[in-house]
């Protein structure tokens, strides 16, 4: 079984994107596919979203009035109509592949036709500061549980249960991992570098966090100190609390980084302290947009107002992203990269459906 990955364009990449090109920090490209069956209500709904770093740049929804690959970032809008035609056809093929795979998985798990089931996948690659591959991913899940995943060596698979072992044996016989590795080390890297160049004003920016420390009395004896970081990009940030210079990791409540809804992110870290001892505690913050790490204390004279509305919006966006991209592992394989042209594929588990596209994929059956 296979999830098709949006390997968007098979055009030759420009010399400006040569391997010697470098960027500050590491970067990533991720695609998330979700197919949900709905017995008695037509074909499964298929949704795909693609991200470079923390920025969504493409989306497809089979339930749209006119389903097409849609740009979600200005720097991808410059791609021509042929690009979007290929993207759209790719997603439509993948929706049909997932429909077949959902049926096969239902059989693997001896499930009835009555219930709704979900097939998810994530794939992509990470680049280091030198523009070279750090790590590749190809992971799949069924009904919210791990199914099968390509290991970090890009040469072997980890199956979560006996059903996934059936798929694993098929893929091992078909040498699917080799095709996965060829894509991840080739086109995935090339296209991520292309996107980083085209979108460098957005993707390679660094917006420092707006910072506050707030004080929230719990009782006459205790209070919560909360260290806020708002409006920062990229999403990677470090927040820690110290008391008299000693880390308070075990006693710190730390939320996941949240999208703010405007392309930036939010995060906070909180610690409960004895009343009257607040000045012994310091918040330490590190972010790419800061010239040097910050050290913050609560200032009793000025309790800043935290933009609660923005935080609520951020939480709403987080929920949407979790629904669309709550992905880890499910099933997938790609045809071998060969300059973007459809390669021959005789494996019983897979069939080539990437002719004339940049997907460099094969559609595989579980």
Curated annotation (Swiss-Prot):
Disulfide bonds join 125-188, 227-283. Residues 207-298 are annotated as: Alpha-3. Residues 115-206 are annotated as: Alpha-2. Residues 334-366 are cytoplasmic. It is found in: Membrane. Glycans are attached at residue 110. One of its GO terms (biological process) is antigen processing and presentation of endogenous peptide antigen via MHC class I via ER pathway, TAP-independent. Residues 25-114 are annotated as: Alpha-1. The chain crosses the membrane at residues 309-333. Residues 25-308 are extracellular. One of its GO terms (cellular component) is recycling endosome membrane. One of its GO terms (molecular function) is peptide antigen binding. InterPro entries: Ig-like_dom (IPR007110), Ig-like_dom_sf (IPR036179), Ig-like_fold (IPR013783), Ig_C1-set (IPR003597), MHC_class-I_related (IPR050208), MHC_I-like_Ag-recog (IPR011161), MHC_I-like_Ag-recog_sf (IPR037055), MHC_I/II-like_Ag-recog (IPR011162). Belongs to the MHC class I family. Heterodimer of an alpha chain and a beta chain (beta-2-microglobulin). PANTHER family: HLA CLASS I HISTOCOMPATIBILITY ANTIGEN, C ALPHA CHAIN, MHC CLASS I-RELATED. Involved in the presentation of foreign antigens to the immune system. This is Class I histocompatibility antigen, Gogo-C*0201 alpha chain.
